[in-house]
């Protein structure tokens, strides 16, 4: 008796890295140009932002244009620093607009946003309710953004526990997961203002956790972004270009890995 062949699903796990995460856009553009379309997407921090907006239907070209038109001041509503430097009201309005107020079950493709539940210190995967809420929770860098409060819980940046959400992509049903790591991976990084100090402290912690998980993805892209200021939109074009170039360079390796995984799964089903 012949069993019905299960569709092969590609998952995309977009990691955190503040503004360096704009490299996700370039990497995804190359994938799309070569017919490698994700069936599911999971994101952490800036990866949740890019992945959430993409899952709601915004084209990568439109996303790129948006990045060139926005400045840090458009995202910042500075508050008295009791829980964070930035209140988050401006970015919440922007997220509602960019996602069209869609809920997770209204997304064009299955999407999950990874955050950290602060009270219990645990990874939390948003898959229900408004997408903007999951993204807002996931991007809440401790000390910079006021934490996101919903359902009686407090959430901060998902990178605290899971910088590149490979496991979340698998939980969405992916057979093959492409991880994109845009965070710090060693080396000297300038820390000459408060934002950079907080961000780099987070990056160091995330890197220590990430090193133990680097082998979880079927393919992990890690563009070199150390020279990019993670607290500024000024290098958006450079960041996107680096993402494109690195994915283009490793494209044959990715294509080969996908075909190999397909063959392995087909052999198991025989």
How would you describe each model-predicted region?
Residues 1-44, 52-270:
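Patatin-like phospholipase
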């Amino acid at each position: 008796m012949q069993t019905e062949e299960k569709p092969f699903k590609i998952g995309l796990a977009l990691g955190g890295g503040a503004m360096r995460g704009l490299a996700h856009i370039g990497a995804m553009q190359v994938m799309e140009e070569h017919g490698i379309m994700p069936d599911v997407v999971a994101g952490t921090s800036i990866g949740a932002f890019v992945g959430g907006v993409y899952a709601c239907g915004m084209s990568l070209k439109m996303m790129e244009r948006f990045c060139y038109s926005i400045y840090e001041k458009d995202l910042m509503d500075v508050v008295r620093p009791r829980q964070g430097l930035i209140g988050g009201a401006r970015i919440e309005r922007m997220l509602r607009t960019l996602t069209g107020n869609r809920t997770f079950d209204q997304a064009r493709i299955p999407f999950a946003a990874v955050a950290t539940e602060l009270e219990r210190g645990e990874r939390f995967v948003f898959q229900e309710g408004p997408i903007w809420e999951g993204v807002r929770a996931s991007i809440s860098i401790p000390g910079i953004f006021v934490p996101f409060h919903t359902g009686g819980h407090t959430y901060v940046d998902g990178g605290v526990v899971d910088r590149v959400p490979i496991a979340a992509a698998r939980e969405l049903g992916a057979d093959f997961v492409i991880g994109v790591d845009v965070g710090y991976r060693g080396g000297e990084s300038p820390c000459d203002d408060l934002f950079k100090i907080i961000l780099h402290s987070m990056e160091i912690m995330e890197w220590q956790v990430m090193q133990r998980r680097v082998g979880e993805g079927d393919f992990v892209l890690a563009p070199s972004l150390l020279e990019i200021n993670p607290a500024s939109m000024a290098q958006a074009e450079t960041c996107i270009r680096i993402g494109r170039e690195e994915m283009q360079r490793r494209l044959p390796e990715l294509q080969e890995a996908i075909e190999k995984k397909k063959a392995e799964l087909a052999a198991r089903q025989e």
